Structure formats: C-alpha cells, structure tokens
From Swiss-Prot:
Name of the protein in its database record: Pyranose dehydrogenase
Glycosites: N95, N110, N195, N337, N367, N502, N510, N541
EC number(s) recorded for this UniProt protein: 1.1.99.29
Gene: pdh1
Matches recorded under Gene3D superfamilies: FAD/NAD(P)-binding domain (3.50.50.60), Glucose Oxidase, domain 3 (3.30.560.10)
Signal peptide: 1-21
Keywords, comma-separated and alphabetical: Carbohydrate metabolism, FAD, Flavoprotein, Glycoprotein, Oxidoreductase, Secreted, Signal
Amino acid sequence: MARFNARLFSIAILGFQVARSAITYQHPDDLPGDVDYDFIVAGGGTAGLVVASRLGENSKWNVLVIEAGPSNKDVFATRVPGLAETLPTSHIDWNYTTVPQQALGGRSLNYSRAMILGGCSTHNGMVYTRGSKDDWNKWADVTGNRDLSWDSILPIMKKVEKFSEDFSDQSVEGHIDPSVHGNDGKLSVVASYTNVSFNDLLLETTKELVDEFPFKLDMNDGNPVGLTWNQYTIDHNAERSSSATAYLESTGDNVHVLLNTRVTRIVPTGKTNFRTVEFAVDAGGPRKQLTAKKEVILSGGFIASPQILMNSGIGDQEALKAVGVDTLVNNPSVGKNVSDQAATLVLFDTTLPNTDFDVDAAIVEWNNSHAGPLATGAPLNHLIWVRLSDDKLSGSDPSSGKDSPHIEFQFSKISHRIPPANVPNQVALPSQDSIGVVIQFSVVNLNSISRGSVSLNDNNPFSHPLIDLNMLGEEQDIAILREGVHSARRMLSSEAFKPFVNGSVHPPANITSDEDLDAFLHTTTKSYLHGVGTLSMSPQNASWGVVDPDFRVKGTTGLRVVDASVIPSVPAGHTQTPVYAFAEYASIVIAKSYN
C-alpha cells in the first residue's frame, strides 16, 4: 500500500474555490505512475524550489522536485530565527569536510550545507544582501549576458521581495531606503533590530572615523560600503522565510516533491540529450529512473551539482577515468573555480552589557507570542562593509569595482560564552575561564582570489566528494584579511568605544606585527560558507565554463543548472540573495524557451 501523501489544500467557502498546493511524497514508491513530468528539478534547495514554483505557474506543466533531505516542516528550529546557529552539524546538514588546506597548516574544515527542503535558505543565517552593482556588472561582462547587469537584474531582485517591518512593528525609517525594495514578492524581508547600547556606539564611530566607516542607509542599493543596519529573510510573524515557505507553499498541485531521495546521475536519453534522472533512497537501495518530457534542471548546490554531473560522465576526461567513470561530455571546467570567502572570528574584552538570554525561556516566549530574543536574526544588528584604501592593498584590486567593499564585519553578540572548538570551521579559542564578556564578530575577506575545486573521491554517488577550497592559497588573500583585523581594531579603539573596550582578546593584544598576525590567521581562518563557481556560466562559445548564458550545460541538450555553482565568483556579500535572483531569472529564461 502506498504511503500517505501530503496533499495540502484549503477551501474558500465563498465561491467554493479550492486552493491546492504542492504534493509531497516521502518515498519513490509513492510517486504516481500516471504522471509524466515536463520538468524534473534535481534538488529542492534555494534555487530549485524557486524554479519549480515559477514553472509550476503554468498549470499545463507537471514538475517534479527530488530532494535528498526531509521537509522543512519536520524541523522546528528551521522556523525560529534565533535558533539558526543550532542547524549546522545537525541531521539536516551534509556535514562535508574539506581536504587538508595547505595554507591553513593542514587543517581540514567542516563545510556546512543544508540537506532539507529549502536548502540553505532553510538553514542559513538569513542575512539578505544583494552584493554590489560592480559584482553584477562584472558577472554580466564575464558571462557575456547583459541580463545580469545591475540595471537589468534589479527589477528581478525587487520582484523577489516582500519587504515589511518586523514582528515588533518598529519603524524602519533611517534603517533602509524603501525605493530599492519590493513589497509584492514571495520572500519576506525585514530590517530587524534590537535596541542595545552597542548600536549607538557604532553610529558614533561613523561620525568620528567617517572615511573608513561611513554610515550607509541601505546596503542593498548597489553601493554597500559603510556601516548599515542588517536585513533578514524573516517574515512579520517572526518566522524564517525560505524558498520552502515563500515559494513552495504557494505552488499548485501540479508540482510534486519527492523527499529523502538522492539524485545519483543524469542519464542520457540520446547521445548528448540528458533528460533522465536516476535516484535512490540509499546506497544499497534500488536505482530508479524518470525521464522529463522537456528538461532536467540540476539544482544541487555548488558541491552536489558538480558531483552529480561528474558521476553522469560530464567532466574532465582524465579525472573521470581515474575513478572509473566513462566520459560522455569532456569538460575540464566541471568542479573547478571554487570561489569562497575567508573569515576569522575576533573577540574584544568589554564592559558593555551582554546580550545573553535563557534559551529555554526564549523558546517558550517565541512559541507563545512569536516575540522575544529568538524572533530576530541576531542580538547585534549591524554589518560593516569596508573598502580598503589603495595603499593598503597588496597587489591589484581584487574587488569587482571602486564601489565594492573588500571586508565585512558581521557582529553576532556580546557574551561570556564563546563558540566551542567543535563548531563548524571553528578553531580553538581562548578558554572560557580566561576571558570576561567579549564583543564577538567575524572579519571576512569578501574577495578571495584563491580558487579551489570539487572532484570525485570515487564513483559512488553516495560518497562525499573531495572539496579543496585552497583557502588563503594566494598571499593577497591573507594580506586583505590581515588589514581587516587592523581595521576592526581601529574601530574598537575609537573615542566612542574607549570607555567600554579593554583591548583585543582574539587575536591577543600583543599580536600586532603583520608577520605575527599572518601566523595567527593561518591557524584561525575558516570558510564563511559562501562557495560558488564550480559550474560557472560563461559566454556561448567560450572554451571555459560549464553552462551557457541560458543555463544549458555546454555540449548537452535537455539539461540546465540553476544554483550557486553557476555564479562565476563570490559577491561582495552573502550568496543567498544572488541565488534567488539567478533562479528567478533562470525561470524566465526556461519558460520563454517554451512559449
């Protein structure tokens, strides 16, 4: 007997209209045998659910999404903004590990990626940043696709958004520029903030050190440099907004979602026509196949998508041969060009009030009223985007342009509690007993020029691939991160902070020279988990790259890729918003090709 299917519906009594939504299936055996799917989306993450939802707006098309993880509705913590930090390393995480990183003293880094419906939009820190105008214009130049230029993509980014005040109904005046935001989209975005004294000190610093830390009203206007209020993908009800909640839940019942099932390969239906998806529940289970009438859209993310392509015989011929995979399309660019951000955590001793709270009590409060400390994205609510002066750059400018930042400061909390050493990507920090209350934030090199790779470990689709970030592989990357630490120290040495900050704890205050700071960074740098580029988009007839400007995999028909892997380089910001924008744009491109 088939397992229970979740057909979610609501009946509007007036007019007797029935509003149906996507149908979910827990096991491949539950799939209906009488449905031919026009499109099969391999991966139900941030991009995959956007594409499935948009294609599903055509009621004549049947769409199937195959997702390796469970439903987001099964995991309470994915709903609560303040519980985001509990999700990495949990059962809804792929729990990847990189190969030893040469420039990090041979350390292997944990690499968190979501394995759940909604992907990283269900699992991340919810920060909503578009990147700079320069980023988008650079991508347009690199790919030969002018539709990706800032002026062309901005209407699509605004189309994504449903911007509103947060649960507290605090005015957003002075925190955002309403003219650069959308109000009618699917994805909820808020300028969520808490009233803490730290905010006032930061704003005072923008007046004192205006050249380095100017105040920026809205970081999402395309010119993000400066200190700005954070924006989050949280709805007015203080719940996380993700591609699962914002897109899938408003989708018709012509969209089917198969959960807990791994896509193993894309199989050719002809010599270069790849429209058949192979999938299985586990490594020992039977492999099943379904063929899309029109196309397969691969949306596994920047690690899983190249792994699936390589297991399908699309990749570097010599590398595939080495692991026993027959080459069907020889493309050495598959899995190359990993572009990511390097970061380090800094701690400053302070007499400011801490932002700690009783988590159990906060969960009760959130359950009862959707308010309290767990209703916001973080206890501290600012980001700073720093552009280094030319004299502080080591070599050529790695940013996308003159209006783009090199460094990000992301503030997290003021606390005596510091992350344990087993937190993903984390390294040993000062012992709890050796410090008091500390201001905690990340210093991020936004423009790493080092490039890494994702490659097959073997020909078992259920094995983790080899992930080499080549973190700090170029000297310029560590030089910029070092300048970021210097900049952070200047900020917290300002007149505004002097009465409240007693110096740097991590790195220790006695580490001041460039040489000593570099040694510190080699042992403490981690990934900021914003990897892109493994299946990079490139011009139509380019000799490099994996997908054309229409997202089709070069050398194939019937197969496109839509996710972070196609973005050529990491933006000067977080990657969530660009992935939404790429997915919305791809949906338009795909639909138009069948119009």
